Amino acid sequence: MEKTYNPTSIEQDLYKTWEEQGYFKPHGDTSKESYSIMIPPPNVTGSLHMGHAFQDTIMDTLIRCERMKGKNTLWQVGTDHAGIATQMVVERKIAAEEGKTKHDYGREAFIDKIWEWKGESGGTITKQLRRLGASVDWDRERFTMDDGLSNAVQEVFVRLYEDDLIYRGKRLVNWDPKLHTAISDLEVENKDTKGHMWHFRYPLADGVKTADGKDYIVVATTRPETMLGDTGVAVNPEDPRYQDLIGKDIILPIVDRRIPIVGDEHADMEKGTGCVKITPAHDFNDYEVGKRHQLPMINILTFDANIRDAAEVFTTNGEPSDAYGTELPAKYHGMERFAARKAIVAEFDELGLLEEVKDHDLQVPYGDRGGVVIEPMLTDQWYVRTAPLAKTAVEAVENGDIQFVPKQYENMYFSWMRDVQDWCISRQLWWGHRIPAWYDNQGNVYVGRSEEEVRQNHNLESVIELHQDEDVLDTWFSSALWTFGTQGWPEQTDDLKVFHPSDVLVTGFDIIFFWVARMIMMTMHFVKDENGKPQVPFKTVYVTGLIRDENGDKMSKSKGNVLDPIDMIDGIDLESLVEKRTGNMMQPQLAAKIEKNTRKTFENGIEAYGTDALRFTLAAMASTGRDINWDMKRLEGYRNFCNKLWNASRYVMMNTEEQDCGFGAGEIEYSLADKWIESQFELAAKAFNNHIDNYRLDMAANTLYEFIWNQFCDWYLELTKPVLWKGTEAQQRGTRRTLITVLEKTLRLAHPVIPYITETIWQSIKPLVDGVEGETIMLQSLPQYDEANFNQEALDDIEWVKAFITSIRNLRAEYDINPGKPLEVMLKADEKDAARLEANKQVLMSLAKLESVRVLAAGEETPACATALVAKSELMIPMAGLIDKDAELARLDKEVAKTQGEIKRIEGKLGNEGFVAKAPEAVIAKEREKLEGYQETLAKLEEQKATIAAL
């Protein structure tokens, strides 16, 4: 083994070997239990971020554990075509490089261009996945637009249409006026904005008056331009101010339209004036109110979000309607929406109908890709009827076929699924799965797997012209089929039989509805077991939190606080990090602040920590709470942990290589410490496996850390030294054998979390361990608890030995006694502890650096001593001649004064009403905790003074 641990030199070559040897593949023995995980397919445009690294570490740890249990494991890998994101990347590329738009290319040539881009640049994320040590089966890599998945998508669409679960309708969607497409709620970012609330007077028709004698009512709005499309005003039916007006009309200013006043719970009596203008074609809440009261829908905007020359009027079912005229005032024709807002407010003011304008904080929806304000827009789109599909999907979670970890996320899932809306699945893009629907010139629609099939099924002559729907399917539609589409469906393949349903889905809470719920609905509708029972896509959904920065803020390019996992593996210098965080920014004005913060936080850039340290940190932080604040200090700590394991392994090798390790015929004797470390290992194996089974990777990592660092390195290796130096041959064989076998088992136990370092060390020690065969640690067995190796007595006895040694070390530190000075020690002990002392004398003398140790006779007088309790015994160190009494008292007086000063300072802080009133609860609690600590220290110091004064 190399002298120092250098992850850079071992990781990439090792991964290449694993992949080339086919170790990541299922072993194919179907008589053994199978285990599968389908990776959430990352966007093909993407690069690996901390969220991916976190979830991939969790998945890889789980898959490596199950592979080492001998299961037939598949970790299915693949990428998502990411419709809108990919199309925009390529549009920007051709604009920058060729000054062209997609329209200059035309649809087919532009799509070819995207495929070309995918071939060149689409592999970034899969390369990075390899760097993480992800043991996915690369030979089975899939893409959501490959032939097999495209076939599955088409099949699902056609069957859903035939089952009357897909329809085309005119409904309200999130419309991106820049990208000219419908987008999902997940692609809408609500930004806090300072805006205004305009209060308009709407005159009452037919001489009607309000309860207080006014001939108008006042409505409040944050979007004045939409009033051109108003078809009603809502008041709360319980509101005494307006009850008499329900059923009456108002005359809408500017457009002179007569619209009704309706009673609806949507109007909040406490909010604003209690009267709400209703624009069903341009607001999601109003759309629902409009449906409840059969109010016509008037669309006033073009797809660019300019005012139309003539409005479009529809019934609540989206059919054309003549309930109102289509005229809009000429001066607004073609006007941009925000310019129209200003002009309409000015016209209300001129008409004397602007009651007041108030400052108002509101959330404005922006498209996260196009960066412009989203408009709710009435458009023709394709929809899935989700209610019938949701019923089965809810039952699967209710009856435990699918379990959420943590369980609280089931409630989030239920609340969505019990109030599920129809799902808009069409997008006005070119890149994606084109909708398999064709139209004739009369507007009749035909759905089928191909134009030939459509003509055949509907007896359409070749003279009848058909044109395919221009739209593509929402990316979530194809990714909803991920668990079964990747395994060969609609064919009934062996893979589908063996690996479906998958065992666990690891995902974020933000896509439980968009992806998880839809996978459950689609899978259960299309995949049935041999008894015809709907199959679930996965048995467990493990929901992770978000990884935030050290201050708890979300990582984002605009905040400049994004950490790239690869930079933590390989390291990055400060200038490159600053450039990375400030280059190509959407908002360049933020660059200076980001640069300042980056230089402050990472003075020397980021050093190379290696993959294992990163993985261990991610695992150790994977508690099942919501969010995780990233901490570079923990990463550094876990790199030190890897280093410690490396150095411990070198110590083991130096003491076992070319030595008799007790695998031959020679006599063998195991020390108490040998039996103790074996027992500690069994406890660690039991705890590790339990934690993995319960998805508590944080506790599993902690178990490894605690065992390797504290028990194996800090204690056991120390306890072996007296035996290796002075023990008999039989004792040395026993200890060498224990050293090498426990290390080998430990490497296997830790391998799923830190694969590279464990494989590297294992390859070096493998020849020293009897009976270990095989080319890689990956395919060795994962240690399980073995009662036969567990010895409670050895555990208790060594805990006593540890307590004895620790007490001596603590007393040396407390009384400032030179750590190397041999001490005389006396023990007031019962029979059991006296026997322990006798049995372990050699180890205690060596590790505690003692001159002598003896048990006191009953009633024996003792001189002034420093004392400590060890179990039921009292340990004593006679102090005479050990220290300079006056110097030690002077030192202690200084410590006492310093501690009293701290106590006074904190008491003053906590006694200050201003501080207590303003400071957060957590800060106050921390100060109280500090105070308690100082008070305990003071009591100890006084005790030490008394002991020394008595000498």
From Swiss-Prot:
Residues that coordinate or bind ATP: K557
Main location: cytoplasm
A single cellular component GO annotation: cytosol
Keywords noted in UniProt: Aminoacyl-tRNA synthetase, ATP-binding, Coiled coil, Cytoplasm, Ligase, Nucleotide-binding, Protein biosynthesis
The keyword Nucleotide-binding belongs to this UniProt entry's keyword annotation: yes
One Pfam family per UniProt: Anticodon_1
Subcellular location: Cytoplasm
Coiled-coil residues: 882-951
Motif 'HIGH' region in this chain: 42-52
Catalysed reaction, written as an equation: tRNA(Val) + L-valine + ATP = L-valyl-tRNA(Val) + AMP + diphosphate
GO aspect biological process, one term: valyl-tRNA aminoacylation
Motif ('KMSKS' region): 554-558
KW Lipid biosynthesis (keyword) present: no
EC number: 6.1.1.9
Annotated GO MF terms: aminoacyl-tRNA deacylase activity; ATP binding; valine-tRNA ligase activity
Quaternary structure (record): Monomer.
Role noted for this protein: Catalyzes the attachment of valine to tRNA(Val). As ValRS can inadvertently accommodate and process structurally similar amino acids such as threonine, to avoid such errors, it has a 'posttransfer' editing activity that hydrolyzes mischarged Thr-tRNA(Val) in a tRNA-dependent manner.
Domain text: ValRS has two distinct active sites: one for aminoacylation and one for editing. The misactivated threonine is translocated from the active site to the editing site. The C-terminal coiled-coil domain is crucial for aminoacylation activity.
PANTHER family linked: VALINE--TRNA LIGASE, CHLOROPLASTIC_MITOCHONDRIAL 2, VALYL-TRNA SYNTHETASES
Family affiliation: Belongs to the class-I aminoacyl-tRNA synthetase family. ValS type 1 subfamily.
Name of the protein this chain belongs to: Valine--tRNA ligase
Lineage start: Bacteria, Pseudomonadati, Pseudomonadota, Gammaproteobacteria, Vibrionales
